[in-house]
Amino acid sequence: MMENKMFCYQCQETVGNQGCSQVGVCGKTPETAGLQDLLIDVTKGLAEVINEVRCKGKEINNVYDDQVSENLFITITNANFDDQMIIEAVRKTLTLKKELLLQLDDQAVLSNRALWMEMDIEAIEKRMQMVGVLETADEDIRSLKQLITYGLKGMAAYNKHAHALGFRKDEIDRFIETTLVKIETSTMSLNDYVALTMETGKYGVQVMELLDQANTSTYGNPEITEVNIGVRNNPGILVSGHDLKDLEMLLEQTKDTGIDVYTHSEM
């Protein structure tokens, strides 16, 4: 049996419907998978410090909430395989965490994950080998933790798009952050994880409502429209995803340039 170079079973196309362990079917390399696992780990650390600062009755600036959603969004399926950008996100997260740690006199209650602050590439590469999906031994607990995490990633994507349009709901940010901490709590039972999975679904509906409000308030209600689905000889840009703010900015920049903009999926 070959040794695992990585482990990812985030999407429905994994090798043998069990998980990619040598390289991703999507093209994700073991290095990228490891960096994404590390980014999730340091995001959990930031979330823990955010929660502790809140418990002290102190306000949290939205920049910290936004970084949590940004990090989760980076790691969703096929969103970002840029290793250098992921390393920069890790370092930015650690820098933000360091700022918040200054607000805590008693750091003894924090986990090793919350206190880890190494930024040099050697330490980052070493930490990558210590974190990831398989660090949870119990298969049932592991599966529920990942199911919740994938739910949070989807929430983070919608959350980020809503933020881009100036809409936010503090309860959603708080749920994401407290849940990132809860799933690593050793006292959680299997039933606790099942209950938290259901609660994640409830907040998933709330963030969908927030994004719908943001999109319709900004651009109006969608309506059936006839469009040309052919191609022309003009230079073109193909847009994927569902970030309407990005699309708006692109359309403004390409106005009267002769460049055709093509969309698919939710666009």
Question: Language-model segments: which ranges?
Answer:
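Metallocofactor- and cofactor-centric catalytic cores in central/energy metabolism, strongly enriched
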Residues: M2-M267
